[in-house]
Amino acid sequence: MQQRRPVRRALLSVSDKAGIIEFAQALSARGVELLSTGGTARLLAEKGLPVTEVSDYTGFPEMMDGRVKTLHPKVHGGILGRRGQDDAIMEQHHIAPIDMVVVNLYPFAETVAREGCSLEDAVENIDIGGPTMVRSAAKNHKDVAIVVKSSDYDAIIKEMDANEGSLTLDTRFDLAIKAFEHTAAYDSMIANYFGSMVPAYHGESKEAAGRFPRTLNLNFIKKQDMRYGENSHQQAAFYIEENVKEASVATAQQVQGKALSYNNIADTDAALECVKEFNEPACVIVKHANPCGVAVSTTILDAYDRAYKTDPTSAFGGIIAFNRELDAETAQAIISRQFVEVIIAPSATEEALKITAAKQNVRVLTCGQWAQRVPGLDFKRVNGGLLVQDRDLGMVSEAELRVVSKRQPTEQELRDALFCWKVAKFVKSNAIVYAKENMTIGIGAGQMSRVYSAKIAGIKAADEGLEVKGSAMASDAFFPFRDGIDAAAAVGVSCVIQPGGSIRDDEVIAAADEHGIAMIFTDMRHFRH
């Protein structure tokens, strides 16, 4: 579908000026007349480009501190005018056709994200003329090209060169889709911001800022189509947020291997988010969204070796995450020892990638280093609705722990307790984690009763010949009965860390004292469903 339209006149008005000088120079060199506004016009003029201010073109000045610039019939008539149909009326009113509109909008998201942003600041960064021009041009895409992304500048110039200064309808239609997506996302941000202030007009208190908007508008960009979803009869795609600020599976670069599956992405996310909890060199192995082995050590090679020993059977076909660069020695250990679906790390050495390349199906992802966790929202889809909550970024320090048993934990028990507490946060509830000397030795996940999770963790440790005596046990939620403590004591657990908060806490603590177990309360729960 060709239907080319020549670009003879373009209107440029951008807040993000990245690449705009070079793009304007390229347009001007190809004989395109340039119209512009405000700061964009001044910038282009400073660079020696022939540019006409919109106010000079319309005969109407910018006014109200720039609130009114482009809202004029000579601008919108030039954009919306249908070639071959509205020519006479345009000529009668001295309206020149505008063939290309280059606009990006006031930085509303960046403004409201700044600490101390007032309602007045936010209001002044709501673009009016920009979205109006974008929508006008997108509506009239049969005749007009609308450009909202600087990443499209080079491709547009190349196509114009290939088509004697014209753009095809296919290109204009694709640009129009991007434009409508752009304005939809922009309006959604504004609606979410104002909606979170309801019912107070100046809803800038901490209480108001914590409210969820009354209408939740979400915008995600499709990154890839999947072969299928969780199961082969389900269709699926992977969508990501724009401008993600934290290293994640969404921003990771795949440097090797076949395409990621739906389950690969879900499990890789679980592994990466868990390994982020640790400052020391760490390895997390995940299977079906649950950690099956976690360890920290002085090197990632030793961390991997210890994590693998937790449950070699479950590690087969798993996802492996590191919080340090993947090196050749560790890559060789993985490839020689097990079948792995995905390896993700902040980076990988060239030597490591040469080794993993021997297994063509192994997917290797690099996600970059992370500094700190970024607050955000978690979503859970239910039939007919969406559950929304803050991300679980809750952490406890050693100083915040409460020892409620008669016996105090030893230094090693305390270290192991804090270690397995971090792991338990990422295990499906009911979650029980046994750990000793900075490695998991048994994990009980997803059981309907907590005592069975405790028993399963003990069984797994015994199956692998791992010594439970003197280990720590973490529980993601309180023990409703003493049976979980009795089960742990039976296999040799000597320290328990849990939130506390049961009406039977006294009975549970008494059980710990009977068995000589040190018990620590965190006063924080980590359910994961």
Curated annotation (Swiss-Prot):
Protein's GO biological process: 'de novo' IMP biosynthetic process
The reaction(s) this protein catalyses: (6R)-10-formyltetrahydrofolate + 5-amino-1-(5-phospho-beta-D-ribosyl)imidazole-4-carboxamide = 5-formamido-1-(5-phospho-D-ribosyl)imidazole-4-carboxamide + (6S)-5,6,7,8-tetrahydrofolate; IMP + H2O = 5-formamido-1-(5-phospho-D-ribosyl)imidazole-4-carboxamide
MF term (GO), any: phosphoribosylaminoimidazolecarboxamide formyltransferase activity
GO cellular component: cytosol
Keywords, in A-Z order: Hydrolase, Multifunctional enzyme, Purine biosynthesis, Transferase
Domain MGS-like, chain residue ranges per copy: 1-148
NCBIfam families xrefs: PRK00881.1, purH
Recorded family membership: Belongs to the PurH family.
Name of the molecule in the record: Bifunctional purine biosynthesis protein PurH
Species the sequence originates in: Salmonella typhimurium (strain LT2 / SGSC1412 / ATCC 700720)
